[in-house]
């Protein structure tokens, strides 16, 4: 019935535009129709179209309304559209546009009729769509959304089994695609976000026969809305899901699913690459600490999308956030190779930071940090402070690698110098203040450490847990246990229940130091109940990084309780606690050390020595196990002189790893005494005595 129903434009000069409408093989200029519209004679204009193009009432009105819309007369277009009984037209079209099977020889003659029916359907649907657009431009957003929704409702009535992949008029498909894309935007603009969510899901789950680009735009818009709208979307309806399919439980999961589907389309060449999609996916996966998944997605991106340097650096950042520092450092080594970008300041700083967390890589990190400092010039000079901070951390970690006392002292001095230099650039950086305080504390400059601990608490407003822990540890090292407990209690009052684990463990150890073992046991029991409740609350969905952030897990609580009972000589309780800890972590040098203490307390020295040696086999750098074996051998050395050199070697090795271990100094003094070296023994006992006066209840390194 209708031929080409689109308006043709041809320019004559700069100002004159002559429009033409074509239908049923007939074309007519719109000059006469527009003149009647200008005079307000809508009915006469409609009659001209009906007579000139052989149209019925709804078709003529639809074309007339579109003409008004194209002319920019939105109010006029609405008046024309209001005169159409669109629902009645839809009902007629529902009968005239059946979903036919692909044409065969018998029904091929019916194809022209089907084409005519689809043209008629498009004309009516386009009228509703343009009415919605007119209302939107006039600021009547809610009305526009309802009109746009009626387009999709009408399509579902006409095509009850969904729009077929073939035999659909292009213009009809274009109208449907525009309406599907417009509806969620209108609901968002009107402020009805739940309707917007429903519209997005309807667009993606119903059969609209959308092209890949249109579908990709809708998926991206929906994902961005879920991530940034602040509206919590309810899970999708189970009725719309295929059995066994994955159902997102919250906004972030649904957004990640959409963005990963989009990336898959990009990789398969089904949609044009959009870099913002990967940026949104990075944000979403970072929110839920799933950067390992992000790295996997980045590895699957087709070559050429990212430069290899950018890919390596982004992968390194993702792996480092996932705790896979070794993989991250290897990627940064490639990126910083002399034939790539050896002076990339950000990559140098990241490499230095990662190396500062591992003693074996600290020397390499020192080189990266020094290169970063040298390259921090001009517009990047503000990053010099970051470079100095990384240099200080790397030097401090390097000082912990077994070396000569002179070299250790030199590295510690240079570490403090670098961190002090960084403070000049970033004097308001709380993290830098904290790290400088810890460096002073590890060197037993407790007065300076206390000052920086208080500065950190002031800088953060007391909102960061590690600041209170640090101050309590410094006070315990100053043997001010009651004050440390007051600080711990104050921190507990200001800390959420789920975050109290490290403070409760600290409080239990303070109780032990003040000879209150009963209260210490009760604190450990409360801590155990808290950790178990937390594990059950989060369930199997709890990520590794989230568990590490708590700093106290169930194994540590059972092990701490076992250590406490061992100090009270409650050996049966120790055995029960160790069994519980062993169920959670089968191999642990610290647990074997406590087991050795248990056997030693029972006067069974062979099993004790075996447990300590097993701990050393498991972790060759375990200082407690080295000291315990050295202590046992030094006791035997009174009767068996040949064991003294072995004990001396083990204790000296322990002191190279941890020169502040007072027990190692004490037992080394005992070895020297048994060996007849009284002067050396005196020096060792004096060192042990001095360290005992500044020994914290937990190592300062536990708060880093």
UniProtKB/Swiss-Prot annotation:
Calmodulin-binding protein essential for pollen germination, but not necessary for microsporogenesis or gametogenesis. Disruption phenotype: Normal pollen development, but no pollen germination. One of its GO terms (cellular component) is extrinsic component of cytoplasmic side of plasma membrane. This is Protein NPG1. The calmodulin-binding domain (CBD) is located between A-448 and A-496. PROSITE patterns: TPR, TPR_REGION. One of its GO terms (molecular function) is calmodulin binding. Keywords: Calmodulin-binding, Repeat, TPR repeat. Expressed only in pollen and in pollen tubes. It comes from Arabidopsis thaliana. Pfam families: TPR_16. One of its GO terms (biological process) is pollen development. Interacts with calmodulin in a calcium-dependent manner. TPR repeats lie at residues 24-57, 58-90, 177-210, 309-342, 430-463, 555-588, 589-622, 662-695.
